[in-house]
Curated annotation (Swiss-Prot):
Keyword annotations: Cytoplasm, Lipid biosynthesis, Lipid metabolism, Phospholipid biosynthesis, Phospholipid metabolism, Transferase
Keyword Lipid biosynthesis: yes
GO molecular function annotations of the record: phosphate:acyl-[acyl carrier protein] acyltransferase activity
Protein name: Phosphate acyltransferase
Name of encoding gene: plsX
Physiological role: Catalyzes the reversible formation of acyl-phosphate (acyl-PO(4)) from acyl-[acyl-carrier-protein] (acyl-ACP). This enzyme utilizes acyl-ACP as fatty acyl donor, but not acyl-CoA.
Location within or outside the cell: Cytoplasm
Predominant subcellular localization, coarse grouping: cytoplasm
Pathway: Lipid metabolism; phospholipid metabolism
Provenance organism: Rhodopseudomonas palustris (strain BisB5)
Assembly and interaction partners: Homodimer. Probably interacts with PlsY.
Top-rank lineage group of the source organism: Bacteria
GO biological process, one term: fatty acid biosynthetic process
UniProt entry tagged with the keyword Metal-binding: no
Catalytic reactions on record: a fatty acyl-[ACP] + phosphate = an acyl phosphate + holo-[ACP]
Length: 353
C-alpha cells in the first residue's frame, strides 16, 4: 500500500478561513483518498465545518490555536506575534518536524513567505524562495515564476529561478530538457534592463544545462506557450498573474452575458454548450490555484486568499502532486548539479502582500 500523503492546512488562512478550507480539503480528499490532514486553527470553528464532512473528519487531526495571521499583517508583525503559536506557523512547522509532507495556506503571502523562510530555511545559496505555478496556455501548461515572492533581484537571482523552474517543469511535464524564457519587454537582445540582459548571458554560458534557454519572451508569450518555463522577478510576475486572472474572469463574464442576451443567443448556447464549458474550464483561475514556494527545505503551497472551496481544493491537489512526484528531492538534485546558480541576491526585497 502506498504511503499516505500528509497535508498540513492553515485552517484560518485566507478571507474565509475554515468555511472554505475544510470543504476544499473534503473535495480534494475525494480525488486523493490516500491523503490525511493536520488542521491548525480554532478547533470549535474547524469541528463545526468537519461535522458536514465525515470522510474528511475520519482522516484529520485538529490542533487548536487561538492565534491566526490576518491578511493585513506585515511579515515582521506576523513573525513577532505568530511565531511558534499561529495556525500558519504550526502548519509550516509540521513539515519541518516531519509530521506532514507539505503545508498549504491561503493566508497573507508576505507573512507566509517570511514564516516559511524562517522556519524551514532556504536551500544553500538561495537568498529567498520563489513562487511558481502552472499556467494554462494554448500548447498545454507552462511553469511561471516568480509570481510575487520577491521584488527585484539581480542576474544571478534570475538564473537561479530558471534552474528551479526548469526542474519543476521536468518533473511535472516529464520533459528531459524543458525550454526556458526570460520575460522581457521585447525579444531582441538589446531590450530590457541590465539585470535581465546579464541573466540571459549567464544562462547562455551554462555548460550542458538540463534545459534549453530560448532567450527573451514578451508578455503575450506566456499565454501562447512560448516556453515551458517563463522566468520573471516577482514584481512583474505578480502583475502578469493578476492581469491574466482578471482577463479570464472578464472573458467568462462577457461570454455569459452575451449568451443570455437574446433568445437566439440562448439557443446557440445550447448547441455550443460543451465548447463554452471547455473554454471556461481551461481559463478558470481556480483551476490554476496553488503556487509552490521553491528554494526551501520543505514544500509550502500558497492558495489565493479569496478563493472558494473548489479553488482551495486545487491548491491541495498541487500540494499532493508535489509530494507524490517527490518534487523537492528532484529539484535539490538539479540545484546541486548547478551550484553556480545558487548565489545570494541581496538586492531582492521581500514582498509584503
Amino acid at each position: 500500500m502506498p504511503q499516505k500523503v500528509r497535508i498540513a492546512l492553515d485552517a484560518m488562512g485566507g478571507d474565509f478561513g475554515p468555511s472554505v478550507v475544510i470543504p476544499g480539503a473534503a473535495i480534494a480528499l475525494g480525488r486523493h483518498p490516500d491523503a490525511e490532514f493536520l488542521l491548525f486553527g480554532d478547533s470549535a470553528l474547524i469541528d463545526k465545518e468537519l461535522a458536514a464532512h465525515p470522510a474528511l473528519k475520519k482522516v484529520s487531526r485538529v490542533v487548536h490555536t487561538d492565534v491566526a495571521v490576518s491578511m493585513h499583517d506585515k511579515p515582521s508583525q506576523a513573525l513577532r506575534r505568530g511565531r511558534k503559536v499561529s495556525s500558519m506557523w504550526l502548519a509550516i512547522e509540521a513539515v519541518k518536524k516531519g509530521e506532514a509532507d507539505v503545508a498549504v495556506s491561503a493566508g497573507n503571502t508576505g507573512a507566509l513567505m517570511a514564516m516559511a523562510r524562517f522556519c524551514l530555511r532556504t536551500l544553500p545559496g538561495i537568498d529567498r524562495p520563489a513562487i511558481a505555478a502552472t499556467w494554462p496556455t494554448v500548447r498545454g501548461d507552462s511553469v511561471v515564476l516568480d509570481l510575487g515572492a520577491t521584488i527585484g533581484g539581480d542576474a544571478a537571482h534570475l538564473k537561479a529561478l530558471a534552474v528551479m523552474g526548469a526542474a519543476m517543469a521536468s518533473v511535472l511535464f516529464d520533459l528531459e530538457r524543458p525550454t526556458v524564457g526570460l520575460l522581457n519587454i521585447g525579444v531582441e537582445e538589446i531590450k530590457g534592463g541590465e539585470e535581465i540582459r546579464e541573466a540571459a548571458e549567464l544562462l547562455r554560458a551554462m555548460q550542458s544545462p538540463p534545459f534549453e534557454f530560448i532567450g527573451f519572451v514578451e508578455g503575450d508569450g506566456i499565454g501562447s506557450g512560448a516556453a515551458d518555463v517563463i522566468v520573471s522577478e516577482g514584481f512583474s510576475g505578480n502583475i502578469a498573474l493578476k492581469a491574466a486572472e482578471g482577463t479570464a474572469r472578464q472573458i467568462i463574464q462577457l461570454l455569459r452575458d452575451a449568451m443570455s442576451r437574446t433568445w437566439s443567443a440562448k439557443i446557440g448556447y445550447l448547441f455550443a454548450r460543451g465548447a463554452f464549458r471547455a473554454l471556461r474550464d481551461k481559463i478558470d483561475p481556480n483551476k490554476s490555484n496553488g503556487g509552490v514556494f521553491l528554494g526551501l527545505n520543505g514544500i509550502v503551497v500558497k492558495s489565493h486568499g479569496g478563493t472558494n472551496a473548489d479553488g482551495f481544493a486545487y491548491a491541495v491537489d498541487v500540494s499532493y502532486d508535489m509530494v507524490r512526484y517527490d518534487l523537492l528531492t528532484k529539484i535539490n538534485q538539479t540545484l546541486n548539479r548547478e551550484t553556480g546558480a545558487l548565489v545570494s541576491t541581496p538586492s531582492a526585497q521581500e514582498a509584503v502582500s
